Structure formats: C-alpha cells, structure tokens
C-alpha cells in the first residue's frame, strides 16, 4: 500500500464529508488524510481526498471551476436553504420557462453575496453551522463568487433543475436562494450533486478513482533536471541560469518537487521530495 494517495470519491447523500473521510481512511488503511472542499451532508458527488504527504498538494491543485447539478424547490422555506430544515411549503403559481432562463443568464459574472448561515465558515473559532443549529444569531461577512456558466436543464413546477460552474467560495444553496428571490418567492435546494472540482471527477458507479496529482497541478514541468537529483533531494540551493522565472514541477525517478525560479536563477522549494504512487512514475 502506498504512503500517499490522491483520490476522487463519490460521497453519497445524507452523509457528512467527515464521515465519508472516515470510511475512506478505513478503506485504504491510512490515518493521515483530508479533503479538498466540503460537501453539504444532503449533497452527493465528488469529494477529493488526499492521503499522507499528498495533503500538502491541496493549495496547488487546479480545483476550479467547480461544477454542480442542482434542483431548486420553489415555494419551500428552510434556514439551511436545503431540505434538511424545511419550515414551510407554499403553493405558488407556475412561471414561464423563459423568465427562469433569463434570471439564470443574468447571474453570470462575479459578485458579492452573504454565504448561508449553515456553512463551514468560522465565527470566532466556531463553525457557522454549529451556531446556526444552536439558534445563535450572527452575521457572516460578504464574500465573492464567480458564476462562469449556468444552464437550465429542466423546469417541472415547482422544481428548477440547473447546472452551474463556479469559483471557489461559491455556495450553490445561495445561488438557489438568489434565483427564488428574483422570482419573488422562497426556495431551497432539494438536491445537489458536485460533478467535478477542476478536472477531478468520479462517477456514482465508479465510486473511487485514484488520481495522478501531476495531471492536476497547473505548473509546467522543467525538463533535463536529472543532474540536480541529489541536490534537490537534499533541499540544497541551486542556480538555474537562463531559466524563465515562475513555478515549475521537477520530476525525478523516485520523487517530484514544486519549485519557484526567480529572475536571478535562484530557486525556492515550494514543496520538495513528494513521493510517487508507483503507478504514476514517469507518466507525465
């Protein structure tokens, strides 16, 4: 068994991300692990998990756009903006599909919004969702999100089924709330599925896919570096003359590193001596 892994797992609905992580730790027999982006308990879909030293790659992985499919239930009200805390259901008249399509199209772009109270945001060191469950009153700071694309898949009143690709920091539950408010009603998400984080994905039938991290790092690979293998393994200073400044991946026989080259040819180790999963040696 490898000491490090990067996997895309398909989280079932009504299971917390932490509970899913615990199952995966047991499945792979590894104790050190973390996930890239939290999925709401009621949601299903892609949960990217790193084991061992691969958790160090999280800040560097290409994880946007994030793609989701969601169903908005018009007329339903919930403090959590999903079906877990339904407070009331109102029967509302049907809308023209073209009006819904116009609203969805108007959301494309970047804007500030207030994230939902039932979220993983921190308030004085505590998770917002814990405070919300206790009935505590608090205000979350506005954050920014970008909607790159949003498409109406179907409208069967009172359910609006749509697909959306977004930036980090976006809550699809809030997108559902915004759509409902523009229609003049309450609304909650009755289903939510994360399709992908960047290019990292897995299907419901596949369940678990082992990923090659080299395919999901946004940096170019620096070639002809084998003569520096021992020096870089030991983390020694080296100078790379005539190299363009920037961040690079350097691959050796038994490990790879992420470095930054400066204009004077000096380098900084961003991440050094990251081991391969045997299957992925020399695949990039």
UniProtKB/Swiss-Prot annotation:
Uppermost EC category: isomerase
E.C. designation(s): 5.4.99.25
The entry's keywords: Isomerase, tRNA processing
Catalytic reactions of this protein: uridine(55) in tRNA = pseudouridine(55) in tRNA
Active site: 40
GO biological process, one term: mRNA pseudouridine synthesis
Record-level Gene Ontology MF annotations: RNA binding; tRNA pseudouridine(55) synthase activity
Entry keyword annotation includes tRNA processing: yes
Statement: the UniProt record of this protein carries the keyword Ribonucleoprotein: no
Pfam families: TruB_N (PF01509)
PANTHER family, per database record: PSEUDOURIDYLATE SYNTHASE TRUB1, TRNA-PSEUDOURIDINE SYNTHASE
Family under the similarity heading: Belongs to the pseudouridine synthase TruB family. Type 1 subfamily.
Cited function: Responsible for synthesis of pseudouridine from uracil-55 in the psi GC loop of transfer RNAs.
Protein name (database record): tRNA pseudouridine synthase B
